């Protein structure tokens, strides 16, 4: 689950009742339950531990969209140059307008998940459903000479936050167009123009591991935070087997 228990005035009793009900309903139906926190809920740590959740350190980066000039001062000079160079090369940022465009982007994501992330990608139907719900968020595409070369799927919460969800670009093939850089910049630009509060990267990896993606994201002027994650493993053997299976799939795909 993305987010965390929503409780008014830090009411621990309400949070306890929510988690108690959740665990009772799903502990026998799920291998694990995980909260990927999108805001500060450290005051609930003892409540989570009481229900056999464990805390995992996990970073995030949040870009404040208060002012265009201030934001560009916070961004790295190299990243700003890449944005300008990509646009100057003829690449354009646009919102998805057709299912055909969305399918082109999905193929880019499939290749990324198969070759780099080495994990299954959700079915195209999910992206199509998101596209057909305009109030849910935005899908930005990067196009070059009429072809989709990258994009990003961004849920939007009210008039406050725009999130990075799925992102991919043909960076290896079109280096001068910087498709992933432009895809990341697209929701930032949209948020500035529409007076949103933050752009949320929705994760920057564990602080205990080197993570190249975190280095990439950090150059967009965001603030690093650690809201962490809480996980409850209901069936340890099945959970371990699933981890082994995913690693095995990754090895197979890399051959």
Language-model segments: which ranges?
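Conserved short loop/helix modules at catalytic or binding sites
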Residues: 1
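Aromatic (often tryptophan-rich) hydrophobic motifs at membrane interfaces
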Residues: 4, 8-12, 16-24, 126-236, ...
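Short, conserved beta-strand segments within well-ordered enzyme catalytic domains
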Residues: 6, 34-36
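Short, flexible active-site-proximal loops enriched in glycine and acidic residues
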Residues: 13, 31, 54-56
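Hydrophobic, Leu/Ile/Phe/Ala-enriched alpha-helical segments that form helix-helix packing faces
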Residues: 22-27, 109
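Terminal substrate-recognition subdomain of acyl/acetyltransferases
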Residues: 24, 36-91, 198, 203-255
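Short acidic/polar active-site loop segments enriched in Thr and Asp
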Residues: 29-33, 197
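A conserved beta-strand-loop-helix scaffold within acyl/acetyltransferase catalytic domains
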Residues: 37-176, 189
């Amino acid at each position: 689950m993305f987010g965390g228990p929503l409780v008014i005035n830090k009411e621990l009793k309400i949070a306890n009742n929510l988690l108690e009900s959740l665990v009772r309903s799903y502990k026998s139906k799920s291998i694990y339950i995980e909260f990927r926190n999108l805001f500060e809920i450290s005051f609930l740590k003892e409540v989570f531990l009481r229900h056999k959740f464990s805390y995992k350190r996990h970073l995030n980066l949040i870009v404040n969209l208060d002012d265009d000039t201030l934001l560009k001062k916070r961004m790295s000079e190299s990243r700003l140059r890449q944005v300008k160079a990509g646009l100057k090369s003829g690449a354009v940022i646009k919102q998805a307008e057709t299912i055909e465009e969305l399918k082109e982007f999905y193929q880019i994501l499939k290749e990324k998940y198969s070759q780099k992330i080495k994990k299954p990608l959700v079915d195209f139907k999910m992206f199509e459903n998101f596209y057909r719900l305009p109030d849910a968020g935005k899908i930005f595409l990067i196009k070059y000479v009429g072809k989709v070369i990258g994009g990003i799927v961004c849920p939007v919460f009210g008039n406050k936050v725009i999130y990075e969800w799925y992102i991919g670009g043909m960076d290896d093939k079109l280096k001068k167009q910087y498709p992933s850089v432009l895809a990341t910049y697209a929701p930032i630009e949209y948020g500035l123009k529409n007076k949103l509060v933050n752009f949320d990267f929705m994760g920057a990896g564990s602080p205990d591991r080197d993570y190249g993606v975190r280095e990439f994201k950090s150059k967009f002027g965001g603030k690093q935070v650690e809201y962490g994650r809480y996980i409850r493993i209901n069936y340890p053997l099945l959970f371990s087997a699933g981890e082994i299976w995913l690693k095995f799939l990754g090895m197979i795909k890399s051959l």
